[in-house]
Amino acid sequence: MMFGFGLLKQYAGTTEQISTAAEALVGRSTTLTEALKAAAINVGRKPVETTDLAAIKEVEARAIGGDIESDGGVTAVASKAVARNQKIGEDNEKTNLGDVIAEIDVKVTRDREVTSEDAEAVIRAELNHSPFNNIIPGGVAESVTAAYKLNCNPCNVSL
């Protein structure tokens, strides 16, 4: 499903505005899993929430090209972390995004470059699960969008 770069324009800014997520990706492969690693660099100490889980699930499914394993992937790790975090009151005791993404190289065995469709889908997943209808600055959706921007640079697509 194409959205005509609408979400990318609205939530990611122009291609000239390289975010901290994009800066974290400079010199790295701009694949889906690298985008998750950039999110871990940017907001890795943030407790994992449902918003993150939805975005991670979308990234993992797109990286492997289909259905994700119910108990073996990074989505399963994120799901368990969210369930645990919902029971814990203190943020400093919660599982954070960096802990979940630390296992990505072992948990996700296939990967590919980020496309505009990937960025749109991850933004939509994060927005659909956000209680405030926004994406997390430096988070998964922004990092995937930054990876797309780097893959696209230089190109004549004006976001």
From Swiss-Prot:
Any one Gene Ontology cellular component term annotated for this protein? cytosol
- Kindly indicate whether the keyword Protein biosynthesis belongs to this entry: no
- Indicate where this protein resides in the cell: Cytoplasm; Nucleus
Q: Which Pfam families does the record match to this protein?
A: SMP
Q: Describe the location of the SMP domain by residue ranges.
A: 30-87, 96-151
Q: Identify the main location.
A: cytoplasm
Oxidoreductase is among the record's keywords: no
Q: Which InterPro entries does this UniProt record tie to the protein?
A: LEA_SMP, LEA_SMP_dom
The alphabetized UniProt keywords are:
Cytoplasm, Nucleus, Repeat
Q: Which family does it belong to?
A: Belongs to the LEA type SMP family.
Q: What does this protein do?
A: LEA proteins are late embryonic proteins abundant in higher plant seed embryos. The function of those proteins is not known.
What is the designated name of this protein?
Answer: Late embryogenesis abundant protein 50
